[in-house]
Design a protein with these regions (language model features):
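Loop-centered beta-sheet repeat module
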Residues: 207-214, 223-231, 243-249
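Core alpha/beta catalytic barrel or barrel-like domain that forms the active/cofactor pocket
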Residues: 127-138, 145-147, 178-197, 228-245, ...
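A generic structural motif
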Residues: 27, 97-103, 160, 200-206, ...
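Catalytic-core signal marking the mid-to-C-terminal active-site face
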Residues: 212, 220-222, 226-227, 252-444
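Active-site-proximal beta-alpha loop/turn segments in soluble metabolic enzymes
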Residues: 148-158, 191-205, 235-240, 255-258
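ATP/Mg2+-dependent ligation/transfer catalytic cores
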Residues: 1-184, 206, 226, 382-444
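Short, hydrophobic beta-strand segments
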Residues: 92-98, 194-200, 247
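Short glycine/proline-enriched loop/turn "hinge" motifs that connect secondary-structure elements
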Residues: 81-88, 125-127, 185-190, 238, ...
Length: 444
């Protein structure tokens, strides 16, 4: 993590000939927003004097109480490597303040900060490593995105089958220019599908990095004449894109508290409790980690996405997997989230659920180490295995029943988010789709 001072940033802006600075933040959906200023206005911004209309942002303020201010996080200063070398463009990620100087409680970044602070109070640091998947599609003659690709590549393929290889390479190099430690990148199962994994870090920095990652991917793809999409399931009968979260807790001296060499699985009681908390709250959490109608098209058996609420030390079909540890570092992989999620809210509910498991000493059921997709309904029922919500409205109903998870977000954000998502689902179910026309028009 950078440790910049105000003077550091002013000096870098002058030395690097930075002409514009983008003050970035997210709405409740995780859409990146920004206010652009020239370098002459930077000192004003660093004094938290940059005001904007909060009523224009989804999930923020009412018209009658809409004056809000951006408070830059100095450690997030980065210069965009793809912009011109003269009059460069930099960015600062920002927290949101109300007019009275207090923090805006529904700012997604602040929501995550609150849960991180709760963990710190009991001696834990929350580290997360995401696995972000996306598609690279062609654009049409007007430059608009399509779901078409010439390539036929699959898992771990390379050029000439992998036509997006050059774009993916430039994405990785750009990320490294911006300070990312990229661990690996490769082609995924579906044609035109890719994955880039960057090193785990503390949760707030990881959420910031996910937002930066999505911006870089879309920007570099466009330079290659491609459209990058993080839509979870853009094509029928193909694998969808997820964002597996590899999570661990560390104590005040940096030790992984999920480790226990005396346990048969190498896992501490805190690790089991954390899993128990995730499994207890996962139905409600899914409303946040899988936030759009299309998210639930990914939850189909046989397409590398979880359907069942279970865990395993090695099996990849359940919701939660414990990957082979690297040097005794146990991590818990939650396989359901997708990249449509607001990363700040997604990580907030993941950590909060795990902490509830630890505080309440919630032991998970026994692990299931066989292929869940090959188990009959009777076998699943006998094992006590339940399913994730199968659509956005079902997830919303589960969310509304879970007071603990709702409390993580706060009443104001809960109200605005659920209202917006119910409207989204109602719009969806009233649509007449191409599938319906093909199925019924000619015979009814």
């Amino acid at each position: 993590m950078n440790n910049y001072t105000r003077e550091d940033i002013l000096r870098m802006v002058e030395e690097e000939d930075v002409g514009f600075i983008r003050l970035q933040f997210t709405d409740m959906y995780g859409t990146l927003k920004n206010v652009a200023i020239t370098s002459s206005q930077l000192e004003k911004a660093l004094d938290n004097e940059c005001m904007f209309d909060g009523s224009a942002i989804e999930g923020f303020a009412r018209m009658e109480d809409s004056d809000m201010y951006l408070r830059p996080d100095l450690n997030t200063f980065e210069i965009f490597p793809w912009r011109p070398q003269q009059g460069k463009v930099a960015r600062l990620l920002c927290d949101v303040q109300k007019a009275d100087g207090s923090m805006f409680e529904s700012d997604p970044r602040y929501v995550l900060k609150k849960v991180i602070a709760e963990a710190k109070e009991i001696g834990y640091t929350f580290d997360v490593g995401p696995e972000c998947e996306f598609f690279l599609f062609h654009t049409d003659e007007d430059g608009l995105p399509t779901t078409f690709s010439h390539e036929k590549a699959s898992y771990f393929d390379l050029g000439p089958l992998d036509l997006g290889e050059n774009a993916r390479r430039d994405i990785v190099l750009t990320l490294e220019d911006m300070g990312f430690e990229v661990e690996e990148s490769h082609h995924e199962f579906a044609p035109a599908q890719h994955e880039v994994d960057f090193k785990y870090d503390e949760a707030l920095l990881t959420a910031d990095n996910i937002m930066t990652f999505k911006l870089v991917v879309k920007t570099i793809a466009k330079r290659h004449g491609l459209h990058a999409t993080f839509m979870p399931k853009p094509k029928y009968n193909e694998n969808g894109s997820g964002m597996h979260m590899n999570m661990s807790l560390h104590n005040e001296v940096g030790e992984n508290v999920f480790n226990d060499k005396h346990d048969p699985n190498g896992m501490s009681k805190e690790a089991y409790y954390f899993i128990g908390g995730l499994m207890k709250h996962i139905k409600a959490m899914t409303f946040i980690t899988n936030p759009i109608v299309n998210s639930y098209k990914r939850f189909v058996p046989g397409f590398e996405a979880p359907v069942h609420i279970a865990w395993s030390r090695k099996n990849r079909t359940p919701l939660i997997r414990i990957p082979a540890d690297r040097g005794g570092n146990v991590r818990i992989e939650l396989r359901s989230p997708d990249t449509a999620a607001n990363p700040y809210l997604a990580l907030a509910v993941c950590l909060a659920a795990g902490l509830d498991g630890i505080r309440s000493k919630i032991m998970p059921p026994d692990s299931i180490d066989r292929n869940l997709f090959e188990m009959s309904e009777e076998e699943l029922k006998e094992a006590g295995v339940e399913k994730l919500p199968m659509n956005l409205m079902e997830a919303c109903q589960e969310f509304e029943k879970d007071e603990y998870i709702k409390n993580v977000l706060g009443n104001d954000l809960v109200q605005k988010y659920t209202q917006a998502k119910k409207k989204e689902y109602e719009e969806y179910v009233t649509q007449v789709t191409e599938w319906e026309l093909n199925k019924y028009l000619h015979r009814i």
